[in-house]
Amino acid sequence: QCVHQGDGHRGHDGTHECSVCASWWWSGNLTPGIHIGTDGTPGGYGIWDVTGTDFQCLYKSTGWPEEYQFRSYDLNNVHFSMADVPLMPSDISASVKNAYMQYVNAYPQNNDNEVLINIWNWNSDWTLSVVDENRKTLPYTEVWAYDPLHIAALSVKRFNNAGLKSTPSFITDKFTHFFKVKADDADTDLVITVTTIYGFLFLN
């Protein structure tokens, strides 16, 4: 027996049924068009298809097609530094500065040719495949990570505040539904395929 429960507020991690408010609307307010939760999940809701005892579900991101189930990042082009928050007071407490530094430490400038994949509705029964342009299958590692888009769209903007006195709310959290692969070189194209337990196939 499986019980599915919906919650209409912000959601993160695990299998999403709904995450309408994302970061309680903060990300879209600070960066128009970027409505995502603290783990990078787009604001959205679950679609349930029930026929007799047969049940299928899919997370639907608001304003996106059903096929939008993950986001990938070329980490050669993702990095954060103190230069991104010039308005942060120089005398801010160590605890507040360290809260921001977790993003700087997670994403320093590098050329390691790594790609981070955020599959926000990941389930252990799903499968992931990453193949490069030479048809080489690349191994992946499941990692805890911060979503770079949420950092840029919300956390950086909350910390870049001359009136900052404490750690802002709803900043980017570290979550488990991330995967990392390493390409042979910086210019290699990748085909990322995610297959759900119901056989739905998503490509990028």
Identify the function of each model-found stretch:
Residues Q1-A94, N98, K136-L138, K157, ...:
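Conserved beta-sheet core of the metallophosphoesterase superfamily
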Residues E133-Y140, K182, T195, F202:
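Cleavable N-terminal export/targeting peptides
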Residues N110-D112, D125, D185-D189:
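Extracellular Ig-like/FN3 beta-sandwich strand-entry sites
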Residues L128, D187-Y198:
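Short, aromatic- and glycine-rich surface loops/edge beta-strands on solvent-exposed regions
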Residues K60, F200-N204:
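Edge beta-strands of extracellular beta-sandwich domains
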Residues S124-S155:
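Extended low-complexity, serine/threonine- and proline-enriched intrinsically disordered segments
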